[in-house]
Amino acid sequence: VVLGGPWADKLIVSARISGNQRDRDGISLFIVDKSADGVSTQDYPTVDGGRASEVVLENVTVSGDAIIGDAGSGLDILEEGVDYGIAAICAEAIGHMKMLNDATVEYCRTRKQFGVPIGSFQVLQHRMVDMFMEYEQSVSMTYMVNMKLDEDAAARAKAAAGAKVQIGKSGRFVGQEAVQLHGGMGMTEELNVGHFFKRLTMIDTQFGNVDHHLKRFAAA
């Protein structure tokens, strides 16, 4: 699955050229033209409104200058790229969470029940405070991972894993609470709340989900 694949002209493909399955050395990255012989794609929409491609490679050949970096050392480059990608989507996610927080607070100020705004109910105030706390924790972790990007690979990887765990957990919590506090309209097509929740759900799966990065953080 290649997110954004329908708009790509070239693909970066990882392939093992030597060694055993679990060896770090022996993996290389290649630039492959999407129109090359042996490359086939099937485009489809994703749940968050984006597009992706299913890519199949069959007997594809590339020239020697298609390799990125030194032969057999592509895993380090790939891992660095993933960590930078995590930092970027963490920043995107906190923007979505802020929007959901703001929209929920505004809705609870205007929606009335029993003659008063539902935002005056203490139990709902507590839930909105919890949403805000999850957002603030995510902001802090996003700052942290961006500050660690230029450090050594181990520090960068641990920061990226920690941030991805926080973003995944907080994004799900904030999205669920926003939908519930908006009531039945929370998942309607006309309201953007449900669309932001879908995007946060997709972000959790990109570059590895919470479970994957918990294990990565523990091993760092």
Where are these regions (language model features)?
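Residue-level signal for inorganic ion chemistry
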Residues: F30, V55-L57, M97, S138
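A short, charged helix-loop
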Residues: S53-G81
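Flexible, small-/acidic-enriched active-site or ligand-binding loops
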Residues: D33-S63
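A short core secondary-structure module
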Residues: V1-T41
